[in-house]
Amino acid sequence: MSILVSGGAGYIGSHTCVELLNAGYDIVVADNYYNSCPEALKRVREITGKDFKFVEADMTDHAAVEKVFAENPGIDRVIQFAAYKAVGESVSKPIEYYSNNLNCTLNILDVMRRYDCHNIIFSSSATVYGDPASVPIREDFPVGATTNPYGTTKVFTERILTDCCKADPELNVALLRYFNPIGAHPSGKIGEDPNGIPNNLVPYIAKVAVGKLEKVHVYGNDYPTPDGTGVRDYIHVVDLARGHVAAIRKLEEKPGLFICNLGTGHGYSVLDVIHAFSKACGKELPYVIDPRRPGDIAECWCDPSKAKRELGWEAEYGIDEMCRDSWNWQSHNPDGYKTAE
C-alpha cells in the first residue's frame, strides 16, 4: 500500500516526502511543476537514499488524476498539497484560485472513491480563521470570515471534505491547519524556492541576504502589535512535515474527521524575523516600511495543545533554528534549485 502525495515537489510537499520515506512509507508523488521543479525530488532521493514513483500530472485534470490511480494500484491514502498558494495573488486572481484549488481536491475525492482509497490529509491553513477576535487560536474558533480568496478556497475545501466525510462512513479526513512554515531541511539540499519574486517573508529576506534583492519590504508598521508589524506563528517546515506523519498514524488509530492546528504557539513579528535572520547570516539586513497589503491581518498564532494531546506531536525548532536552516539553504543555493543546473 502507498501514499499519494499530490503537489509533492513543492516546498512543504518535498519535506513531507523526506519524513514519510524516513518513516518507512511507500509514496507516489504527483506534481505538475507549476511552482516547483524536478530537482527537489532528486534531492529528496539523495537525502533519504530511497526511491519512489513520480507522475507528472495536473490535479485539475480529472483524467490525469484517474491515470495516477489506475497506474499505481495500492494507493490507500492521499496527502493533498496541490494548490495555488500566494495570498496577494489570490486577491487579484480570484477565479484562477477558486478554479484550481477546489478542482484539485474535488477530482482527487471523486477518483479516490472509485479506487477504494478512504483516507485523505488536507493541507489547510490558518487563513481559514480570518482575522481572529483573539489569540491564541483554537480549532473551535469560527472559520469562514477570511480576508482573501486563498483563505476562502481553504474554507470551501474543508467544507467539501467535511460533507464527504459525513456522507461516507468509510472516508477518513484530517484537516491540518498550518500556520506559517519557514526554514529548510538541515542538510541544505531542499528548501523554499518560489518562482519569481517571493511572496512570503522569509524567502524574500533570504534573497536580500544573498544579494539577489536590495532590501526587505515590511508591509505596515501600524498594526496593534508590540512593534507595529504583523505577528505570525512561524513553524519549521521539518516540524510541519513530521506533523503529517503523525496525522497518518492518527487516522489509522481513530478513523473519521480530525481537525488540528500545526504551529508552535509563539508569535513573532516581521521585525523579529528580520533580526533573527540577520543573526543567522551575520549581517544587518536593510528593510523599508511600505503600506499594508490587502488581505493581511495584525496577528495570528495558535494554541497547539490539541496536536500535542491527540497527535503526540509538537514543534521542536525555534525561530533561530528556522532562520539558521533557511540561511543554510539559501547560501548554498543562491538561485534555488537552478543553482544545480
Give the predicted meaning of each segment:
Residues 1-184:
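N-terminal Rossmann-like NAD(P)+-binding domain of SDR-like oxidoreductases, especially those catalyzing
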